């Protein structure tokens, strides 16, 4: 269920301060974060945010189409390796 419009988007305060500092200084280094629940806001456009997926930080370059989505949507946590084939069926 989407968040109420009167509440506004959620973004962790520590991530917001890092984003504002990066925009202010023009720094293009990836911003490391564990906050997968934070929403992408327009000030993040053009920045690379390294989102933690439980094992490592996945670099996510923010574009205009990503606004309104959560950071965790772009850093998958599970790897799908396909179903194991039955050995009897091969013979």
Curated annotation (Swiss-Prot):
Biological process according to GO: ribosomal small subunit assembly; translation
Functional summary from the UniProt entry: Protein S19 forms a complex with S13 that binds strongly to the 16S ribosomal RNA.
GO CC list: cytoplasm; small ribosomal subunit
Protein family (similarity comment): Belongs to the universal ribosomal protein uS19 family.
GO terms of molecular function: rRNA binding; structural constituent of ribosome
HAMAP family membership: Ribosomal_uS19 (MF_00531)
Keyword check for Coiled coil: no
Keywords: Ribonucleoprotein, Ribosomal protein, RNA-binding, rRNA-binding
Superkingdom classification of source: Bacteria
Protein's UniProt name: Small ribosomal subunit protein uS19
Any Pfam family hit: Ribosomal_S19
Keyword Ribonucleoprotein listed: yes
